[in-house]
Amino acid sequence: MMALGGAGMALTSTQASAQAAPPVQAKLVHHVFFWLKRPGNQADRDQLIAGLRTLRAIAVIRDLQIGVPASTEKRDVVDSSFDVSELMVFDNAVDQKVYQDHEIHQAFVKSCEHLWQKVVVYDMQTLD
């Protein structure tokens, strides 16, 4: 009986902690997919990835992930035709605009745009 009462008290304590937690602040997620002019060219891919890594110096970027298509199960809904992708997280749209206008981003575009034939961007506002 005591164990049950203790568990009940722990549950109540956990519920109180969950209720007291601050609300999650929405973020802006910026996901970019690049298709190279010369698909499969390792030097071009490496140069693009090196350029993307320079963007980490921009302070308003909360998180930056850089990657290539994953070796996952082939399914009709999976598009793995891109060569390189980057995913960034910002606190808000104002910070994303600061990033777009930042000299490091502008230098990246100038030094790497000759590498890609196509770029697709998905911007998302998180809900929770």
Model-predicted segments: where are they?
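Short, glycine- and small/hydrophobic-rich beta-strand elements in well-ordered beta-sheets
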Residues: 18-20, 56-83, 121-126
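Short, well-ordered beta-strand segments in beta-rich or mixed alpha/beta enzyme
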Residues: 27-36, 72-100
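An amphipathic, aromatic/His-enriched active-site/gating alpha helix that lines ligand/cofactor pockets
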Residues: 2, 23, 50, 54-60, ...
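N-terminal secretory signal peptides
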Residues: 20-55, 59-65
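N-terminal export signals
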Residues: 1-18
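Compositionally biased, intrinsically disordered low-complexity segments enriched
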Residues: 17, 21, 32-33, 67, ...
